[in-house]
Amino acid sequence: MLTKEYRGVASINGPLVVVDGVTDVGFDEMVEVITPDKHKRRGRVLQVSKNRAVIQVFEGTSGLATETTRVKFLRHPMEIALSRDILGRVFNGVGEPIDGGGEVYSNKKYNINGNAINPYSRQYPRNYIQTGVSAIDGLITLIRGQKLPIFSGNGLPHNQLAAQIARQARLGDDNEDFAVVFVAMGIKHDDANFFINSFEKSGVLQNVVVFLNLADDPAVERIIAPRIGLTAAEYLAFEEGMHILVIMTDMTNYCEALRELSSRREEVPSRKGYPGYLYSDLASLYERAGMIKGERGSITQLPILTMPNDDITHPVPDLTGYITEGQIVLKRDLYQRGVYPPINILPSLSRLMKDGIGEGFTREDHPNVSSQLYAAYSRVQEVKSLASVIGEDELSSLDQTYLKFGRVFEKRFLSQGREENRTIEQTLDLAWEVLSELPPTELDRISGEELEKYYRGSVNDNG
């Protein structure tokens, strides 16, 4: 395929280069930017308007001159070579190996932009992915093919939780091929080292593909990294027949990079300076999760984002919530009280949970136990509000029982060690131990048969 080369550029602004007088140039086309000293830098076409092309340069524009810089259009979008050999490898944000293991060789390259799965071709998500974290497995169950974000805040242990899930995640059926694609955007070097060391020491790295975009890497790579990670996931899922969990952190850094580029392009800003197309851009990533009829594999997404000032109405968590199928919310107050992971279950939910738990999936009592835990913990918050007005000593004995239940629930069920991996059976058994702090008359969401079988106290106890 013939390439076109142009000498001289119209303007340079941050990571963007504008070239005038171009013909037959396509959106997302890859570009070689040749510096005056003959070094090559990569770029891609961001915008085409009549005979003008706007190009984002991956390695930045430092040292470029408008008159002597040459631009070569390569006539193809950004692509990545993929094979099953990517498992166990570590790449940078543009898909280059950084683990010393050499290039990945393949007869075929894949367009990183991919496509959202056709709704008609989608298969409804079923079955669950066990994370080993009781709060998630028991109350906000992650379903195969789902997209379930984690809403965190600065200083909360979302990195530790992400690494723990990546280490512990498995399917209910061990006979299925399962792997994790881990994409990090704009993270610090010590966080990157933490993730790699965590995967290596636990022995799971051989079943993980890692893409790392560091805080001092070009911002434009932050926009590319999740697309490369999802392309790798699509290859493993739909060509190799594997079930893939994609963990992406931190989506707020991704959106900040998008805002920076939008500002450079002098686009009209929307809420808090983010581009007006933020919703559709996020959807182009999140909608690449799912299952396809007739295909064996699946892609499940667990995007993680930090909410500025813990504001859940901020555009990034707000728009993410519209696209995804629930959310897991971390709470600063729980973390300050020593609860790890500090998951606030009341605003958290998994919209697909009901279709992947219960008899035939987890255990027959799971739906009712989950519902009862939510109801009881909600009552705990009401009792705490009352106690703050009249004092604990003035509470009824039943209300004091609920306060005790709340303390036990947070200490024994929500809290667990960072290396502790609980099976779904252990999680449900622990849920019954906690619920048994309440008299059976208060467990109105659980059937009599389940009470007889699992309740740890006396079923005849009326409190």
UniProtKB/Swiss-Prot annotation:
Keywords of the record: ATP synthesis, Hydrogen ion transport, Ion transport, Transport
Named from the GO MF annotations, one term is: ATP binding
Q: Name one GO cellular component term.
A: proton-transporting ATP synthase complex
Instruction: Give the top-rank taxon of the lineage listed in the UniProt record for this protein.
Output: Bacteria
Report whether Mitochondrion shows up as a keyword of the record. Answer: no
Which one Pfam family would you cite for this protein? ATP-synt_ab
Gene Ontology annotations of biological process type: proton motive force-driven plasma membrane ATP synthesis
Q: Which CDD domains match?
A: ATP-synt_V_A-type_beta_C, ATP-synt_V_A-type_beta_N, V_A-ATPase_B
Q: Which NCBIfam families match?
A: PRK04196.1 (NF003235)
Annotated function: Produces ATP from ADP in the presence of a proton gradient across the membrane. The V-type beta chain is a regulatory subunit.
Instruction: Give the similarity note.
Output: Belongs to the ATPase alpha/beta chains family.
What is this protein's record name? V-type ATP synthase beta chain
**Organism per entry:** Halothermothrix orenii (strain H 168 / OCM 544 / DSM 9562)
